[in-house]
Amino acid sequence: MPAPAAKDQAWEAVIGLETHVQLGTDSKIFTAASTTFGDEPNTHIDPVVCGLPGTLPVLNQKVLEYAVKAAMALNLNIAEHSKFDRKQYFYPDLPKNYQISQYDEPIAEEGCIEVEVAEKGKDTYLKTIGIERLHMEEDAGKLVHAGSDRLAGSTHSLVDYNRAGVALAEIVSKPDLRTGREAAEYASEIRRIMRYLGVSDGNMQEGSLRCDVNISVRRGPDAPFGTKVEIKNMNSFSAIQKACEYEIKRQIKAYETGEPIVQETRLWDEGKQLTKSMRSKEGASDYRYFPDPDLGPIEVSADQRESWRAELPELPAAKRHRYADELGLSQYDARVLTDERPMADYFEAVVGAGADAKLAANWITGDIAAHVNSNRLSYAELPFRPEKLAEMVQLIDGGKISGKIAKEILPELLEKGGSPKAIVDERGLGIISDPAAIEAIVDELLGAHPDEVEAFRGGKTKLQGFFVGQLMKKTGGKADPKLANQILSKKLKV
């Protein structure tokens, strides 16, 4: 319990996350059985998955590569030598009654990532979150509780072992998180990094990324940690945030009313928006870890590490900084553009084709992203190719067409592709920038509205906006706005 001497201090939450990332290999971690999601239950099992007598596991080398690359992206130190251990526990989803994991010699330790936190009603801030370790392990099967609301009152349970033996990278953060929002942003950044690397799709709905939250509260930053509670069953970043916020309030209330906090595992109930007790929390000694006798030591040479490091892409945080510092984008635009690698790649291709970065960002984060999302497209499938968007941006930037005209032709370009310049030329949609042509239209407008002209010259100068509107209406929005205003000002003051 938090120290009594700290009662004058505000409560502070202490949060750490265990993030389980399914590595996107075609076969499982120790066997050639398929990892395809959504197939008939219990069709991707074999003697190794079930631990039948006489079978031996063999480490999938692609799993090792993906785990090391993930660790490098999280700035972890890669161990030259590590090993696998058996974690003993009895549960229906564990066919061997033990899980092959890594205990005291994981593949990587001691790293950190930078997280951008956007708290509602507050300024966005950067926070460095320490990462204790990343280790490899095999996933368990999946229990399906039938007959009622998940565990509560279910009449029977079914077990699907298709997931058993799928490769996991478990990423354990340090207890550096202080709010539910920070926890959600951290988990989101982990997924973003894994997707950039291509080592996992991070699909939370399919269980490709799952988070367990460890949370306690204390009186101020110098007080000892309180009793830690683990929370499971959160399948979205929003659920992570809400579960943390609920549990923080629950624990503070318990301490203030003298109710003991039990070290336990609790489930997040999305329907009721609360956490519920599931079981007492085991300690490491309960699992009776010992080195797996069927698997030899894991060795990653310096040459192999450097070879894999050379294959890493530019990561989200580095992109965000570059977009802001070198391209002059706002923090918001940099964040949106780097959220998914395909969008960032599309943006960079547009800028690489000569488009102004800020204008390109506006179009991509606005109309184009809306079209991609509403039609469930990938950027690779989008008919409007990056070089053609660059062409449209250059037409706008060069004063050849207005933003209004660009919006009019955009739906066709998004659906069919093609050249913006060709469409503009074919349909005569270019900006009217001939002073004589605009002057003739202005003379016509002034002659048609003598009362407004007299009122303007009598001091109602805001009427210039009326004339600009009439001019744009008459030209279909094609008159050069700057030139039109200059000519109108000159004519109205005569």
Swiss-Prot record:
Belongs to the GatB/GatE family. GatB subfamily. The keyword Magnesium does not apply. One of its GO terms (molecular function) is glutaminyl-tRNA synthase (glutamine-hydrolyzing) activity. Keywords: ATP-binding, Ligase, Nucleotide-binding, Protein biosynthesis. It holds the Pfam family GatB_N. Heterotrimer of A, B and C subunits. The keyword Lipoprotein does not apply. Its EC number is 6.3.5.-. It catalyses: L-glutamyl-tRNA(Gln) + L-glutamine + ATP + H2O = L-glutaminyl-tRNA(Gln) + L-glutamate + ADP + phosphate + H(+); L-aspartyl-tRNA(Asn) + L-glutamine + ATP + H2O = L-asparaginyl-tRNA(Asn) + L-glutamate + ADP + phosphate + 2 H(+). Allows the formation of correctly charged Asn-tRNA(Asn) or Gln-tRNA(Gln) through the transamidation of misacylated Asp-tRNA(Asn) or Glu-tRNA(Gln) in organisms which lack either or both of asparaginyl-tRNA or glutaminyl-tRNA synthetases. The reaction takes place in the presence of glutamine and ATP through an activated phospho-Asp-tRNA(Asn) or phospho-Glu-tRNA(Gln). This is Aspartyl/glutamyl-tRNA(Asn/Gln) amidotransferase subunit B. GO terms for biological process: glutaminyl-tRNAGln biosynthesis via transamidation; translation. It is an enzyme of class 6 (ligase). It comes from Synechococcus sp. (strain CC9605). SUPFAM superfamilies: GatB/YqeY motif (SSF89095), Glutamine synthetase/guanido kinase (SSF55931).
